């Protein structure tokens, strides 16, 4: 592991668990029956603790949509052609995608990152980072998807995005992805890190039929078999290099960077969760700072959450990616902060306690 990445990991500190009773005491003193705001109260307490006991704040918030292409697309694991990755990056920059609408609705700053797309460089744009580590990955079913150097560079790119956001005063982050065929490396990563089977968690992605899902599961299994020694070796960065993607590694770095900067981060759907799982394998403490935003409609997501022992905030049947679930989660995180900060106490409101 590079010295720079090691230094970043050393900067990640666990939250102070002793602050949770402080948060609970405050929430219990607000003008409502205790616990009546349910998971919003749990979320408010987490945000208070992440902030080190200061008033919880998530504004301004920013979502990074990280894009990359995948060599495994050559195996026919997606209904969409690979050029859609570039086309959707252009759509994000033009403001026409689902994440553009939801981010604008929630008042969230949106940035787009080329971590590993194919083709010519994109034209400059004020909300775009042309930080390409490589032009796509290799086919994980035939070779390591990335070199170790490429993987660490993508991780450090994500870290740098978090650090830049923190330096600009951003108080919370969200993850988003774009990359045709990226549910395949994500599935492989879940299998490698969590001990799940391809048959159990491989899903349709952008709409494969049952036969397509079966072929996709076989490709995942082939990749896992090819890289079995690396998986067994237990080096999480090596696993990410063999089975992941450039945008996935970038998002994993974003999660690590958020934790190093003590920023809460809303984790989007299937691909972003794979990045989170990779980040957690590399640096388990990142779990203190991550909010799993929603239950992906991918059929493998339930066993993934069971393996992690986590429960997403929302279950809306989403399976788009792009950061759409993260945008909704950040709105809930803002709501939780406002509950904590702005509700009256029983004493201040002159309300009798039950």
UniProtKB/Swiss-Prot annotation:
A GO BP entry: cobalamin biosynthetic process
Alphabetized Pfam families for the sequence: DBI_PRT
SUPFAM superfamilies assigned: Nicotinate mononucleotide:5,6-dimethylbenzimidazole phosphoribosyltransferase (CobT)
InterPro entries: Nict_dMeBzImd_PRibTrfase, Nict_dMeBzImd_PRibTrfase_bact, Nict_dMeBzImd_PRibTrfase_N, Nict_dMeBzImd_PRibTrfase_sf
Catalyses which reaction(s): 5,6-dimethylbenzimidazole + nicotinate beta-D-ribonucleotide = alpha-ribazole 5'-phosphate + nicotinate + H(+)
Sorted UniProt keywords: Cobalamin biosynthesis, Glycosyltransferase, Transferase
Pathway: Nucleoside biosynthesis; alpha-ribazole biosynthesis; alpha-ribazole from 5,6-dimethylbenzimidazole: step 1/2
Domain of life: Bacteria
GO MF annotation, one: nicotinate-nucleotide-dimethylbenzimidazole phosphoribosyltransferase activity
Positions in coiled-coil regions: none
Active site (UniProt): 322
Keyword 4Fe-4S attributed: no
Catalytic activity, EC: 2.4.2.21
Key word Transferase present: yes
PANTHER family in the record: NICOTINATE-NUCLEOTIDE--DIMETHYLBENZIMIDAZOLE PHOSPHORIBOSYLTRANSFERASE
Record's function text: Catalyzes the synthesis of alpha-ribazole-5'-phosphate from nicotinate mononucleotide (NAMN) and 5,6-dimethylbenzimidazole (DMB).
Family from the record: Belongs to the CobT family.
HAMAP family xrefs: CobT
Protein name, per record: Nicotinate-nucleotide--dimethylbenzimidazole phosphoribosyltransferase
């Amino acid at each position: 592991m590079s010295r720079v990445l090691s230094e970043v990991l050393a900067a990640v500190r666990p939250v102070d668990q002793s602050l949770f009773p402080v948060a609970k005491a405050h929430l219990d003193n607000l003008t409502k029956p205790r616990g009546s705001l349910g998971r919003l109260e749990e979320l408010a307490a987490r945000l208070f603790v992440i902030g080190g006991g200061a008033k919880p704040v998530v504004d301004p918030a920013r979502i990074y949509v990280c894009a990359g292409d995948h060599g495994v697309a050559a195996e026919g694991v997606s209904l969409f052609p690979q050029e859609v990755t570039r086309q959707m990056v252009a759509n994000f920059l033009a403001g026409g995608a689902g994440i553009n609408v939801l981010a604008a609705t929630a008042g969230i700053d949106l940035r787009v990152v080329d971590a590993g797309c194919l083709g010519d460089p994109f034209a400059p744009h004020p909300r775009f980072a042309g930080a390409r580590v490589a032009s796509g990955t290799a086919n994980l079913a035939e070779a390591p998807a990335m070199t170790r150097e490429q993987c660490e560079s993508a991780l450090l790119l994500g870290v740098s995005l978090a650090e830049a956001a923190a330096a600009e005063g951003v108080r919370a982050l969200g993850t988003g992805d774009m990359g045709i065929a990226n549910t395949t490396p994500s599935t492989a990563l879940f299998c490698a890190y969590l001990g799940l089977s391809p048959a159990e968690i491989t899903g349709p992605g952008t709409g494969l039929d049952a036969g397509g899902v079966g072929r996709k599961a076989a490709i995942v299994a082939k990749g896992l078999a090819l890289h079995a020694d690396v998986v067994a070796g237990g080096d999480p960065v090596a696993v990410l290099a063999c089975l992941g993607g450039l945008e996935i590694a970038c998002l994993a770095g974003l999660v690590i960077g958020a934790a190093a900067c003590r920023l809460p981060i809303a984790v989007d759907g299937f691909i972003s969760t794979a990045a989170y799982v990779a980040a957690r394998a590399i640096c388990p403490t990142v779990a203190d700072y991550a909010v799993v935003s929603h239950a992906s409609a991918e059929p493998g997501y339930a066993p993934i959450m069971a393996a992690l022992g986590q429960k997403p905030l929302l279950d809306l049947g989403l399976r788009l990616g792009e950061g759409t679930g993260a945008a909704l989660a950040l709105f809930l995180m803002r709501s939780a902060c406002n509950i904590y900060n702005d509700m009256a106490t029983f004493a201040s409101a002159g309300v009798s306690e039950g």
